[in-house]
């Protein structure tokens, strides 16, 4: 209920537009790193032969339910090497869990290692250090039968001198007249935009910015094209 599949339709359509623009029409091969439950990917599998990676077996089971034809691997996107090439690499929400520049660099190197020359890499950080003026609060209420869920997301940066931030989720669950409250705390990365572009360049990508919207909110995707010679 927190992140239903249909909530990804708008954004996934814009990822699909970029892939169509960048790739030669064919049954191209794509790899999603950190696929999670596979909601975003589920809107792309009709046009692409997809493979997906995640560290969590539970997430992979959820992904399998809505993406039954996708090849799945349990592994860390910073280190995995599948030994073959793809036409495009995608990293959606999972990129936020990279906590250091070394994490980012290793992940970008993974993307480059799995791409054909001229292949496409798409990712999109939620926040940049330069433009995050927290705390930020988002909330939403959803209902399903007798169950009502309200969740509140509180994002803040306790120490602007480091590369991490915290996101706290509070869930207010009402069912049959009873209220249950649960909390979940996530530690995520927060980097200057220039660091993203610099590290992608170091991994061998030329980078362009593509603005998309999700729920009416503008959001930047970084689209990298793999060069034959890595940039220093």
Kindly give the residue locations of the regions a language model identified:
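C-terminal lobe and adjacent flexible extensions of AdoMet/dcAdoMet transferase-like proteins
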Residues: 187-232
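Conserved class I S-adenosyl-L-methionine
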Residues: 1-36
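A short acidic, Gly/Pro-enriched loop at the edge of an enzyme's catalytic core
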Residues: 78-89
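SAM-dependent methyltransferase
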Residues: 125-194
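A short glycine-rich, Lys/Arg-flanked "PGG" loop and its adjoining helix->strand segment in the class I
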Residues: 105-117
């Amino acid at each position: 209920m927190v992140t239903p599949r249909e909530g990804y339709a708008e954004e996934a359509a814009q990822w699909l537009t970029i892939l169509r623009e960048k790739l030669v029409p064919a049954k191209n091969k794509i790899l999603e790193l950190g696929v999670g439950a596979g909601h975003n990917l589920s809107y792309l599998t009709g046009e692409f032969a997809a493979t997906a990676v995640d560290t969590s077996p539970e997430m992979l089971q959820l992904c399998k339910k809505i993406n039954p034809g996708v090849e799945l691997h349990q592994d860390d996107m910073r280190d995995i090497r599948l030994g073959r090439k793809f036409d495009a690499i995608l990293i959606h929400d999972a990129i936020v869990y990279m906590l250091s520049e070394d994490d980012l660099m290793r992940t970008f190197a993974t993307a480059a290692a799995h791409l054909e020359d001229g292949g496409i890499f798409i990712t999109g950080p939620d926040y940049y250090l330069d433009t995050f003026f927290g705390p930020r609060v988002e909330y939403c209420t959803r209902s399903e039968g007798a169950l009502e869920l309200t969740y509140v997301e509180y994002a803040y940066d306790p120490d602007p001198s480091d590369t991490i931030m915290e996101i706290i989720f509070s869930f207010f669950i009402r069912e049959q007249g009873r209220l249950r409250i649960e909390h979940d705390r996530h530690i995520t990365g927060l980097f200057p935009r220039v660091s993203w572009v610099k590290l992608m360049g170091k991994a061998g990508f030329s980078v362009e910015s593509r603005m998309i919207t999700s729920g009416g909110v503008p959001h930047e995707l970084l689209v990298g094209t793999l060069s034959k010679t890595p940039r220093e």
